[in-house]
Amino acid sequence: MKSFLSSCTTGGCGAKIGPGELSKVLSGLPVFQDPQLLVGFDASDDAAVYQINEDTAIVSTVDFFTPMVEDPRTFGRIAAANALSDVYAMGGSPLFALNLVCYPEREDIQDLGEILAGGAEKLQEAGAVLCGGHSIYDREPKYGLAVTGRLNPRQIWKNNTPQPGDRLILTKPLGVGIVMAALRGEMAEAAAVEAALASMQRLNKYAAEKARDFPIHACTDITGFGLLAHTREMAGGSTTIVLYPSALPYIAQAYTYAQGYLLTAAGQRNRNFMEGAVEFGDTPFPLQELMLDPQTSGGLLLSVPGDCAQEALRAIQETEPQAALIGEVLPRQDFPILLG
């Protein structure tokens, strides 16, 4: 059987359409109005939120992509963790999911079974129910989930509502996209691959559960657009976010790979999108690339009031030891993002 990696031109969230191109396409769609639709696609948030009654809202999201690893079950776990993440990023809890499958007709069907088994493992860990799905034949394997969850409509974690004085917490290390590019090029060290796989398979459930004990002003998960583009979305039009590159958690080998100009196409699309929104100044090139690197099943970026940020960080580090304070929120300046 032809390997997963050799059969796919790209993998994971690095396969996402770039943020600039996607914005142009979505701008031509009608904006649907419904008083119960609390978060729609026009908000560029992580999931849709639809209110059912005073105390309950449904959160709905979908995510799928091509493999970035050879092992089918590992791929299934990563894809499921990534799809579930959007529910956690909104402050919700997943209820049920549907499989989304594209699979080559000539590939071993047992490998598809392994993919689905890996996804089911993560759904069980999340406490969600698998209810069915849809499958088609395709030239490249693709897998993901449509996930439905619930939350209190008064406690939605939107991605663009930080407040001046907030501090930013990132719950997972950066660099998985660069490491996966090195793996595809057969240049990745075993320790780097192990760290990246562990991060991508880790549910954001545990960080979200710790964060719920604190007032969260804004939240998003870091995926294919990279830290900088997701931070740009969080800043919106009314605040500026200062990031501290020296405080960023990252997979150590990813810095070395970036230093050797082992880059990703998606990272360069992200760089183009950020032109005019950030000045890198004397920030070392490898750190620039880590901030632009497309993450698959990346961590949560939480905007927390400054007076409880350290306490929140300590709580989150009980389950996510690499979590770090990486920035702060200011009133609007000349740029949406500054590097400190």
Curated annotation (Swiss-Prot):
Binding locations of ATP: 16, 43-45, 63, 86, 133-135
Residues at which Mg(2+) binds: 46, 86, 221
Cofactor(s) recorded in Swiss-Prot or TrEMBL: Mg(2+)
Note on cofactor: Binds 1 Mg(2+) ion per monomer.
A GO molecular function held by the record: magnesium ion binding
An individual GO BP term: selenocysteine biosynthetic process
Regions annotated as coiled coil: none
Name of the molecule in the record: Selenide, water dikinase
